[in-house]
Amino acid sequence: MLRMLKRQQLHPGMILLLFWLCYLIEDQKVQAGNCWLQQGKNGRCQVLYMPGMSREECCRSGRLGTSWTEEDVPNSTLFRWMIFNGGAPNCIPCKETCDNVDCGPGKRCKMNRRSKPRCVCAPDCSNVTWKGPVCGSDGKTYRDECALLKSKCKGHPDLEVQYQGKCKKTCRDVLCPGSSTCVVDQTNNAYCVTCNRICPEVMSPDQYLCGNDGIVYASACHLRRATCLLGRSIGVAYEGKCIKAKSCDDIHCSAGKKCLWDAKMSRGRCAVCAESCPESRSEEAVCASDNTTYPSECAMKQAACSLGVLLEVKHSGSCNCK
């Protein structure tokens, strides 16, 4: 290059300028690496987002957890890191502090015990006016609405407040918000639902449902509407029109369900049978319609499936208590 510059007889100042430009271009060359969505507890980068990306591009989003590795390695090495090594080594997190970290609504950035920035649930409860317990859409009672919002943040995005106060077994004293109506479901829990006054026209006979009350409903919408107006759950016995069955042998259940015979009403209904039940606590015991105490409602349903007969909860607790 010097020989070429001498041949052109350039001014010494111009030669120095060219050398300086070459240095700048070489020094500012973008270094490609790999962008990752998170750094694991083992300190390695995990969940590859994009290979061949500079650190500046990778960290531009400001997302907490995004990390970068500078090694430009073949795909086979990336695969080995992810599958066998628990992630990529020499992991450089984009964020070392909580500065400019956007955790999204209902969350805030907080430094953990290992001095790492982490997004934690911190819902805005400043607009919550009711300070007492609330019943959630999952049927659980929460200490207050703020506690429910924290649970919603921690992986239950569909969780909402059903009504104020503890969850109840009847619609008595339940005040539903807006135009929603209180309905008692099949598990004897009170819920607030919105009643559809108009159902779309039935296009196929496959939409027919036989209700647990022995009435044929044109569609699931029609059954829900009847449930709303009645104020308690009707439930689906089986798909199709109701038939005069002599036993469960006459009833066809869809896959994964078994027919249970209701001797009292002389009709059957299809139910999902659980293979196993979680360990139950003493307060979960129920008294069933056969006057037997079961450790839990799940255990009662298991017994019903084994016997092939319908069992329902008479009341919570032991049969000897009432």
Curated annotation (Swiss-Prot):
Record: glycosylation sites: 75, 127, 291
The UniProt record lists the keyword Transmembrane: no
Native source species: Danio rerio (Zebrafish)
Domain Follistatin-like: 97-120, 170-193, 247-271
Pfam families noted in UniProt: FOLN (PF09289), FST_N (PF21333), Kazal_2 (PF07648)
Domain Kazal-like span(s) in chain numbering: 103-169, 189-244, 267-321
Signal peptide: 1-32
Gene Ontology annotations for the cellular component aspect, listed alphabetically: extracellular region; extracellular space
Tissue expression from the record: Not expressed in the organizer region. Expression in gastrulating embryos is confined to anterior and paraxial regions, which give rise to head mesoderm and the first five somites. In addition, expressed transiently in a subset of cells in the posterior notochord anlage. Later, expression is seen in brain, eyes and somites.
TB domain segment(s): 33-106
Keyword Ribosomal protein among record annotations: no
Name by which UniProt lists this protein: Follistatin-A
One GO-annotated biological process of the protein: regulation of BMP signaling pathway
Function: Binds directly to activin and functions as an activin antagonist. Specific inhibitor of the biosynthesis and secretion of pituitary follicle stimulating hormone (fsh). Inhibits bmp-signaling during later stages of development including late phases of dorsoventral patterning, to refine the early pattern set up by the interaction of chordino and bmp2/4. Not involved in organizer function or early phases of dorsoventral pattern formation.
Xref: PANTHER family: FOLLISTATIN, SPARC OSTEONECTIN
Keywords attached to this entry: Developmental protein, Disulfide bond, Glycoprotein, Repeat, Signal
Single GO MF descriptor: activin binding
Subunit and interaction comment: Monomer.
Disulfide bond residue pairs: 35-58, 45-91, 59-94, 98-109, 103-119, 121-153, 125-146, 135-167, 195-228, 199-221, 210-242, 273-305, 277-298, 287-319
Annotated InterPro entries: Fol_N (IPR003645), Follistatin/Osteonectin_EGF (IPR015369), Kazal_dom (IPR002350), Kazal_dom_sf (IPR036058), TB_dom (IPR017878), TB_dom_sf (IPR036773)
